[in-house]
Amino acid sequence: MCSSDLPAPVTALLSGVLAKAGAYGLLRFAILLLPDAAHRFAPILIALGLVAVIYAAIIALAQTDMKQVIAWSSYSHMGIVAVGLFTLNAEGIDGALFQMLAHGIVIAGLFFSLGMLALRTGTRELAGFGGAANTMPKLALLAMLFAMAGIG
């Protein structure tokens, strides 16, 4: 079962909390317990993180289902976290931790607001949300605020 098949609260939990467990595991175990290995493989993992950022963003642009757009955008943001962690300096790790916190809040809000929009419009397709601001101005504003927060 893919994340787009799950209900909005489950998807929000998976993306908002559980995806960060892997990044926390990298920080706690790979970097702190195995610093020599982290230094040795840091350039490779930074390159993989950059590939994830670019590739997932391109895939997100090609989607028409908003849940897929948000999911691929989430993968891209986790690539930013990986790059920050494997810079192996205080600024990069602090930035990665801040990105994890911000991403968890924003992505959960995006999935919840998308769930409410999809419930009211009957679709998750991007084209089906036209005119949502006219019929549901507060919900559209909330969704737009989370979307803008996700952009940066």
Show which residues each predicted segment covers.
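Hydrophobic transmembrane alpha-helices and their helix-loop junctions in integral membrane proteins
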Residues: S4-G152
